[in-house]
């Protein structure tokens, strides 16, 4: 037999390597936390919160972050801030100098602050996070709604009045029932006492008559 027959064929070797890597457990993916919707008043400053949980500490040499904006779900995303060893503010024309990084990657916080919010800022804000050796990229999505005025608070005066009236009525009813119960109990006790006295007086009269008959 030729000695080369004992050597593994390349195809078998590649198959073995593929099987080996398929058995290696993948890195656990990170979890990103961000509000689904954020309503802010026109002209105010707002913080776009985005935090993440990772099984690994942040290595600034490998960690990366992208913040993007899009007007609608199907619209093109525009990157306005990123982290590559340091924070890089791309200063899009729509935002200018109004975007400020307010997070701390070492504390798993990559939030940004948007100053002097305008109506044109309404839309979708995405934060994309990569933290090797986590293999999967984390994604947080926030829909920013810009309001012209603060929505009016619901008037709860009527509810308070109704609740107080019902509570007062129930208190009066309970008080009346307690008074009636006390009065009835006192009457029952008085009747029991009177019956007991009558019974004792009858016994005493019977004993007196018996003594008179003996004499």
Swiss-Prot record:
- The protein's name: Sodium channel regulatory subunit beta-2
UniProt topological domain (Extracellular) ranges? 30-157
Per the record, the similarity remark reads:
Belongs to the sodium channel auxiliary subunit SCN2B (TC 8.A.17) family.
Q: Which organism is it from?
A: Mus musculus
Transmembrane segments annotated in the record for this chain? 158-179
Q: Which residues carry this modification: Phosphoserine?
A: 192
GO biological process, any? cardiac conduction
Which residue ranges does the entry give as Cytoplasmic-facing topology?
180-215
Superkingdom of source: Eukaryota
Main role? Answer: Regulatory subunit of multiple voltage-gated sodium (Nav) channels directly mediating the depolarization of excitable membranes. Navs, also called VGSCs (voltage-gated sodium channels) or VDSCs (voltage-dependent sodium channels), operate by switching between closed and open conformations depending on the voltage difference across the membrane. In the open conformation they allow Na(+) ions to selectively pass through the pore, along their electrochemical gradient.
Which gene is this protein's source?
Scn2b
Higher taxonomy: Eukaryota, Metazoa, Chordata, Craniata, Vertebrata
Cite the entry's keywords alphabetically.
Cell membrane, Cell projection, Disulfide bond, Glycoprotein, Immunoglobulin domain, Ion transport, Membrane, Phosphoprotein, Signal, Sodium, Sodium transport, Transmembrane, Transmembrane helix, Transport
Glycosylated residues: list them: 42, 66, 74
